[in-house]
Amino acid sequence: MSRSDPILIVGGGLGGLTTALALAQHGRPARVLEGALQFGAIGYGIQFGPNVFHVFDRLGLSEQVLAIADLPVGVVMMDALTGKELIRVPTGPSFCARFKYPYIVVHRIDVHNVLLDACRRNGAVELVSDARDEI
């Protein structure tokens, strides 16, 4: 396998698109195979901690992700049976200062669209939909 052969990535979700972009940034072409007729995502709210936001920063996407994200002032975990508060973690400025990156809440489809747009702009990433028989 030469460095010009694309790395095959099965699945065009958040992980597949992120992997393709990371490979492309390191000079490796990537081919993302998605079984659906078109690239897209199912939607629900998700949370990303500083460790994940660091990846967006490395991909050059932190500004786009911040534009679509909410920055909660804290996270509270509660006992599902009793309703008792178990822990409260402030996620404001001191949190960001400590961990370098924010804790965000965002809609999964919005993050997927940011990654998908970045892949489409990157000449080293090939996106193949309806790829069930192509492998």
Please describe what each predicted stretch is.
Residues 2-7, 24, 53-135:
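Conserved N-terminal helical subregion
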Residues 8, 24-44:
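Glycine-rich FAD pyrophosphate-binding loop
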Residues 13:
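Glycine-rich NAD(P) Rossmann-fold beta1-alpha1 loop
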Residues 16-17:
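N-terminal Rossmann-fold NAD(P) dinucleotide-binding loop
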Residues 37-57:
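Conserved N-terminal glycine-rich FAD pyrophosphate-binding loop of Rossmann-like flavoproteins
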